UniProtKB/Swiss-Prot annotation:
Molecular-function annotations in GO: ATP binding; proton-transporting ATP synthase activity, rotational mechanism
Function: Produces ATP from ADP in the presence of a proton gradient across the membrane. The gamma chain is believed to be important in regulating ATPase activity and the flow of protons through the CF(0) complex.
UniProt organism field: Blochmanniella floridana
Main localization (coarse): membrane
Entry annotated with the keyword Iron: no
Protein name, UniProt field: ATP synthase gamma chain
Subcellular location field: Cell inner membrane
């Protein structure tokens, strides 16, 4: 049976941990707001480029970009986005589970897999699963990621696609729905399919390209793919901070519950000890 001193020390220890979890909750809340701002700022840019690409894809260009052409799938590549730090609930585990299920589906079709990984958690995980799948990785991008940190990793996979070593490219990350909800999501990046509706087709008009449609399309498609990956990174960052904030709040609340239970136990121990001492005093006086 625990002594009164041990229970008191345990309560104090939990109190100290609770202070840390509350501090981490507040830090995560602040970082989440910053990540949300980044996410909202980058969205219009990505959507605007996508509209232009959809419009161009409906045009009658002599030049047909490799990113717009479908082909037989023999190898699939993924940009995998995870966090560098833990204490974020099941955020990374959910992404890994979804990706492993998708990889299993492709393996049944004898399709090879290549991964470009962002975040140390995914790097560690897939190094244990199969290091041969990893072709590129980056970690330590911080709380305010920059496009320049991702260019090399994005370019590696695009080069493999252009060389025919990868036939389809996907992006997997945690999509930020709201503070309480983040869901793992896989989206196809290449080949690019038009999202235009019938109205766009019937009311189609074409651009005049200067100096050349090939130069424009090459640049535009690369910028679009880079912005898609960046958007995934900032959404995953917002999801990470949100999940960490919720996890730390849950830890603080659980700590409070444990402290209440320990206080009840502590009071019972004290009551038992006082009762025992009184009984000893009474029995001692009766002997006298």
């Amino acid at each position: 049976m625990s002594s009164i001193k041990e229970v008191r020390e345990k309560i104090e220890s939990i109190r100290n941990i609770q202070k840390l979890s509350k501090a981490m909750e507040m830090i995560a809340a602040s970082k989440m707001k910053k990540a949300q701002r980044l996410m909202l700022v980058s969205q219009p840019y990505t959507k605007a480029i996508r509209k232009v690409i959809d419009h161009i894809s409906l045009g009658k260009l002599e030049y047909r970009h490799v990113y717009l052409m479908n082909r037989e799938v023999r190898s699939v590549g993924y940009w995998v986005i995870s966090s560098d730090r833990g204490l974020a609930g099941g955020l990374n585990v959910n992404v890994f589970r979804m990706l492993l299920n998708d990889i299993s589906r492709w393996n049944k079709l004898n399709v090879t897999i290549k991964l470009a990984i962002i975040g140390s958690k995914a790097i560690s995980f897939f190094n244990c699963i199969d290091p041969n799948m990893i072709v590129s990785y980056v970690s330590g991008i911080g709380d305010v990621p920059k496009m320049s940190q991702l260019i090399g990793l994005v370019g590696t996979m695009l080069q493999l696609y252009c060389n025919g070593q990868v036939d389809r490219l996907y992006l997997i990350y945690n999509k930020f729905i709201n503070t309480l909800s983040q869901v793992p999501k896989i989206i196809q990046i290449l080949p690019i399919f038009s999202e235009s509706n019938n109205t766009c087709v019937t009311k189609h008009w074409d651009y005049l390209y200067e100096p050349d449609s090939k130069v424009l399309l090459d640049t535009l498609l690369n910028r679009y793919i880079e912005s898609q990956v960046y958007q995934g990174v900032v959404e995953n960052l917002a999801s990470e901070q949100s999940a960490r904030m919720i996890a730390m709040k849950t830890a603080s609340d659980n700590g409070e519950t444990i402290i209440k239970d320990l206080r009840v136990f502590y009071n019972k121990l004290r009551q038992s000890k006082i009762t025992q001492e009184l009984a000893e005093i009474i029995s001692g006086s009766s002997v006298i």
